[in-house]
Protein backbone atom coordinates (compact mmCIF):
# COMPACT_ATOMS: atom_id res chain seq x y z
CA UNK A 1 0.00 0.00 0.00
CA UNK A 2 2.75 2.44 0.93
CA UNK A 3 4.45 1.98 -2.44
CA UNK A 4 1.26 3.29 -4.13
CA UNK A 5 2.24 1.31 -7.23
CA UNK A 6 4.72 -1.54 -7.45
CA UNK A 7 5.87 -3.90 -10.19
CA UNK A 8 5.66 -7.63 -9.55
CA UNK A 9 9.47 -7.83 -9.52
CA UNK A 10 9.78 -4.95 -7.05
CA UNK A 11 7.16 -6.52 -4.80
CA UNK A 12 9.06 -9.80 -4.82
CA UNK A 13 12.32 -7.98 -3.99
CA UNK A 14 10.73 -6.10 -1.09
CA UNK A 15 9.22 -9.31 0.32
CA UNK A 16 12.42 -11.31 -0.08
CA UNK A 17 14.58 -8.61 1.49
CA UNK A 18 12.27 -8.33 4.51
CA UNK A 19 12.24 -12.12 4.94
CA UNK A 20 8.47 -12.45 4.48
CA UNK A 21 8.84 -14.77 1.50
CA UNK A 22 11.86 -16.71 0.26
CA UNK A 23 10.18 -18.95 -2.31
CA UNK A 24 9.29 -17.21 -5.55
CA UNK A 25 6.67 -19.82 -6.41
CA UNK A 26 4.98 -19.43 -3.03
CA UNK A 27 5.14 -15.67 -3.40
CA UNK A 28 3.33 -15.69 -6.78
CA UNK A 29 0.69 -18.02 -5.35
CA UNK A 30 0.01 -15.59 -2.48
CA UNK A 31 -0.12 -12.60 -4.84
CA UNK A 32 -2.59 -14.44 -7.09
CA UNK A 33 -4.84 -15.20 -4.10
CA UNK A 34 -4.79 -11.55 -3.00
CA UNK A 35 -5.73 -10.52 -6.54
CA UNK A 36 -8.47 -13.16 -6.84
CA UNK A 37 -10.03 -12.02 -3.55
CA UNK A 38 -10.00 -8.34 -4.55
CA UNK A 39 -7.35 -7.13 -2.11
CA UNK A 40 -4.99 -5.90 -4.84
CA UNK A 41 -5.39 -4.96 -8.50
CA UNK A 42 -3.14 -5.86 -11.42
CA UNK A 43 -2.54 -3.46 -14.31
CA UNK A 44 -0.66 -3.55 -17.61
CA UNK A 45 0.95 -0.17 -18.27
CA UNK A 46 3.73 -0.70 -20.83
CA UNK A 47 4.35 3.06 -21.02
CA UNK A 48 5.44 2.91 -17.35
CA UNK A 49 7.02 -0.56 -17.09
CA UNK A 50 7.09 -3.89 -18.91
CA UNK A 51 6.14 -5.80 -15.73
CA UNK A 52 2.57 -6.05 -14.43
CA UNK A 53 1.92 -3.32 -11.86
CA UNK A 54 0.01 -3.84 -8.62
CA UNK A 55 -1.92 -1.42 -6.43
CA UNK A 56 -3.95 -1.86 -3.25
CA UNK A 57 -7.71 -2.25 -3.79
CA UNK A 58 -10.54 -0.99 -1.59
CA UNK A 59 -10.96 -4.36 0.17
CA UNK A 60 -7.27 -4.40 0.97
CA UNK A 61 -7.46 -0.87 2.34
CA UNK A 62 -10.43 -1.70 4.55
CA UNK A 63 -8.64 -4.74 5.98
CA UNK A 64 -5.39 -2.90 6.72
CA UNK A 65 -7.06 0.19 8.20
CA UNK A 66 -9.74 -1.55 10.26
CA UNK A 67 -7.92 -4.73 11.32
CA UNK A 68 -4.26 -3.71 11.42
CA UNK A 69 -4.65 -0.02 12.25
CA UNK A 70 -2.54 1.08 9.30
CA UNK A 71 -2.72 4.87 8.77
CA UNK A 72 -4.04 5.87 5.36
CA UNK A 73 -4.83 9.14 3.65
CA UNK A 74 -5.96 8.64 0.07
CA UNK A 75 -8.81 7.54 -2.22
CA UNK A 76 -11.18 5.03 -0.61
CA UNK A 77 -11.04 2.85 -3.71
CA UNK A 78 -7.24 2.81 -3.66
CA UNK A 79 -4.77 4.66 -5.89
CA UNK A 80 -6.13 5.98 -9.18
CA UNK A 81 -4.76 4.21 -12.24
CA UNK A 82 -4.79 6.35 -15.37
CA UNK A 83 -4.35 4.75 -18.76
CA UNK A 84 -1.48 7.12 -19.54
CA UNK A 85 0.38 5.93 -16.44
CA UNK A 86 0.74 9.41 -14.92
CA UNK A 87 2.22 9.09 -11.43
CA UNK A 88 3.03 5.41 -11.82
CA UNK A 89 6.54 5.76 -13.25
CA UNK A 90 7.44 8.21 -10.46
CA UNK A 91 6.29 5.76 -7.79
CA UNK A 92 8.26 2.94 -9.42
CA UNK A 93 11.35 5.16 -9.45
CA UNK A 94 10.97 5.83 -5.72
CA UNK A 95 10.67 2.07 -5.19
CA UNK A 96 13.98 1.53 -7.00
CA UNK A 97 15.70 4.09 -4.76
CA UNK A 98 14.24 2.34 -1.70
CA UNK A 99 15.43 -1.06 -2.93
CA UNK A 100 18.92 0.26 -3.72
CA UNK A 101 19.23 1.61 -0.18
CA UNK A 102 17.93 -1.65 1.31
CA UNK A 103 20.52 -3.64 -0.64
CA UNK A 104 23.29 -1.33 0.57
CA UNK A 105 22.46 -2.20 4.21
CA UNK A 106 22.97 1.48 5.07
CA UNK A 107 19.24 2.13 5.43
CA UNK A 108 18.18 2.64 9.05
CA UNK A 109 14.63 3.91 8.47
CA UNK A 110 12.32 4.87 5.62
CA UNK A 111 9.18 6.92 6.29
CA UNK A 112 7.11 6.83 3.11
CA UNK A 113 4.94 9.49 1.52
CA UNK A 114 1.69 8.09 2.93
CA UNK A 115 3.06 8.14 6.48
CA UNK A 116 4.32 11.68 5.92
CA UNK A 117 0.92 12.84 4.63
CA UNK A 118 -0.85 11.28 7.61
CA UNK A 119 1.63 12.93 9.99
CA UNK A 120 1.16 16.30 8.29
CA UNK A 121 -2.61 16.00 8.76
CA UNK A 122 -2.50 15.56 12.54
CA UNK A 123 0.92 16.35 14.00
CA UNK A 124 1.75 19.61 15.74
CA UNK A 125 5.20 19.58 14.14
CA UNK A 126 4.55 19.17 10.44
CA UNK A 127 6.98 18.85 7.59
CA UNK A 128 6.90 21.71 5.10
CA UNK A 129 6.14 19.33 2.23
CA UNK A 130 4.74 15.86 1.58
CA UNK A 131 8.13 14.44 0.64
CA UNK A 132 8.60 11.17 -1.22
CA UNK A 133 10.29 9.79 1.91
CA UNK A 134 12.12 10.70 5.10
CA UNK A 135 15.26 8.61 5.24
CA UNK A 136 17.90 7.78 7.84
CA UNK A 137 21.16 6.24 6.65
CA UNK A 138 24.09 4.91 8.67
CA UNK A 139 27.13 6.48 7.02
CA UNK A 140 30.68 6.74 8.31
CA UNK A 141 29.85 6.14 11.96
CA UNK A 142 26.93 8.58 12.10
CA UNK A 143 23.26 8.57 11.20
CA UNK A 144 22.18 11.00 8.50
CA UNK A 145 18.52 12.10 8.40
CA UNK A 146 17.09 13.83 5.33
CA UNK A 147 14.00 14.28 3.20
CA UNK A 148 14.15 12.46 -0.12
CA UNK A 149 12.66 13.74 -3.37
CA UNK A 150 12.83 11.75 -6.60
CA UNK A 151 12.64 14.04 -9.64
CA UNK A 152 11.76 12.13 -12.78
CA UNK A 153 10.32 14.87 -15.02
CA UNK A 154 10.87 18.64 -15.21
CA UNK A 155 8.44 21.13 -13.68
CA UNK A 156 7.53 24.68 -14.66
CA UNK A 157 9.52 27.56 -13.19
CA UNK A 158 6.48 28.64 -11.13
CA UNK A 159 6.27 25.18 -9.58
CA UNK A 160 9.94 25.24 -8.61
CA UNK A 161 9.43 28.70 -7.11
CA UNK A 162 6.63 27.25 -4.98
CA UNK A 163 8.81 24.31 -3.92
CA UNK A 164 11.69 26.61 -2.96
CA UNK A 165 9.30 28.63 -0.81
CA UNK A 166 8.12 25.47 0.97
CA UNK A 167 11.61 24.07 1.52
CA UNK A 168 12.85 27.34 2.98
CA UNK A 169 10.09 27.06 5.62
CA UNK A 170 11.22 23.58 6.68
CA UNK A 171 12.07 23.54 10.41
CA UNK A 172 12.01 19.81 11.22
CA UNK A 173 14.73 18.66 8.84
CA UNK A 174 18.21 19.99 8.13
CA UNK A 175 18.69 18.42 4.70
CA UNK A 176 16.78 17.54 1.54
CA UNK A 177 18.25 15.14 -1.02
CA UNK A 178 16.98 15.39 -4.58
CA UNK A 179 17.73 12.36 -6.74
CA UNK A 180 17.31 13.15 -10.43
CA UNK A 181 16.12 10.57 -12.93
CA UNK A 182 18.43 11.88 -15.67
CA UNK A 183 21.46 14.13 -16.07
CA UNK A 184 19.25 16.72 -17.75
CA UNK A 185 16.94 16.80 -14.71
CA UNK A 186 19.98 17.08 -12.43
CA UNK A 187 21.21 20.12 -14.38
CA UNK A 188 17.75 21.67 -14.24
CA UNK A 189 17.56 21.16 -10.47
CA UNK A 190 20.92 22.89 -10.05
CA UNK A 191 19.56 25.90 -11.93
CA UNK A 192 16.18 26.06 -10.21
CA UNK A 193 17.41 25.44 -6.65
CA UNK A 194 20.59 27.51 -6.77
CA UNK A 195 21.14 29.60 -3.62
CA UNK A 196 18.08 28.20 -1.87
CA UNK A 197 18.14 29.05 1.85
CA UNK A 198 18.02 25.42 2.90
CA UNK A 199 20.56 22.62 2.62
CA UNK A 200 19.44 20.91 -0.57
CA UNK A 201 21.67 18.24 -2.10
CA UNK A 202 21.32 17.03 -5.68
CA UNK A 203 22.43 13.62 -6.94
CA UNK A 204 21.72 11.16 -9.72
CA UNK A 205 19.42 8.21 -8.95
CA UNK A 206 21.19 5.97 -11.46
CA UNK A 207 24.44 6.29 -9.45
CA UNK A 208 22.93 4.45 -6.47
CA UNK A 209 23.10 0.90 -7.89
CA UNK A 210 26.75 1.48 -8.87
CA UNK A 211 28.15 2.90 -5.62
CA UNK A 212 27.73 2.76 -1.89
CA UNK A 213 25.42 5.48 -0.51
CA UNK A 214 28.34 6.94 1.43
CA UNK A 215 30.18 7.58 -1.85
CA UNK A 216 27.21 9.01 -3.75
CA UNK A 217 28.24 12.27 -5.41
CA UNK A 218 25.94 15.16 -4.50
CA UNK A 219 26.00 18.91 -5.17
CA UNK A 220 25.06 21.48 -2.54
CA UNK A 221 22.48 23.73 -4.22
CA UNK A 222 23.52 26.72 -2.10
CA UNK A 223 27.20 26.70 -2.99
CA UNK A 224 27.48 24.26 -5.94
CA UNK A 225 30.18 22.46 -3.95
CA UNK A 226 30.47 18.73 -4.67
CA UNK A 227 30.53 16.24 -1.77
CA UNK A 228 30.36 12.55 -1.12
CA UNK A 229 27.13 11.96 0.76
CA UNK A 230 29.04 10.77 3.82
CA UNK A 231 30.99 14.04 3.94
CA UNK A 232 28.16 16.56 3.86
CA UNK A 233 28.08 18.85 6.91
Protein language model annotation of sequence segments:
Residues 1-81:
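Nuclease-adjacent, charged terminal/linker segments that flank catalytic cores
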Residues 8, 141, 154-165, 169-233:
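Non-catalytic C-terminal interaction segments of nucleic acid-processing enzymes
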Residues 15, 31, 35, 97-105, ...:
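Hydrophobic, Leu/Ile/Phe/Ala-enriched alpha-helical segments that form helix-helix packing faces
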